[in-house]
């Protein structure tokens, strides 16, 4: 087993591990004590991977170039773009593009929607016309109603005509019906005397028969 020539350690000594890494910087930076494990490190290359958590800051030249690009807008005209926010706002305030009209059933989608709207309006107009008939239809309905009313009143007219003829035959006094005189009155029936009713009942073959006899008494 080989030993380290500096610390007399085994092959797993930090010096052997350091030797396996390539050395890119031959300058000797000041010793930095990151941990007790690296107290033998002189050049500090073994702990270089610990400094990778914080990336290096940009160089002044790159920073100046980036600032110049932001100031000049990448055109190198030497002027500031003061109206750039206004242009961005105008871009945001632009109207959206109109919807794309796609073909649909032999025509455009807009034409199809227009036809459907027209058909709906026509249907509503037909329904309104059905509820509100025209003048000719109204006249025809009125004539049918009058004819039906005449036929319904035909019997009443006959009855009224007969009553009218009978009223014309009756005598009138100053437009009013006059009483019929006694000579024209029909003769009254003769007066009759008292009557007596005699009832007799008898039984025949188990049936009771009641016989009633009326006799007029002399006055």
UniProtKB/Swiss-Prot annotation:
Induction: Accumulates in leaves but not in shoot apical meristem (SAM) meristem during vernalization in cv. Bd29-1, but expression is independent of vernalization in cv. Bd21. One of its GO terms (biological process) is vernalization response. Mainly expressed in leaves, and at low levels in the shoot apical meristem (SAM). One of its GO terms (cellular component) is nucleus. It is found in: Nucleus. The keyword Nucleus applies. The keyword Signal does not apply. Pfam families: CCT (PF06203). InterPro entries: CCT_domain (IPR010402), CONSTANS-like (IPR045281). Residues 138-180 form the CCT domain. Keywords: Nucleus. PANTHER family: TRANSCRIPTION FACTOR GHD7, ZINC FINGER PROTEIN CONSTANS-LIKE 4. Involved in the regulation of vernalization; this process in essential for flowering in cv. Bd29-1 but seems do not occur in cv. Bd21. This is Protein VERNALIZATION 2.
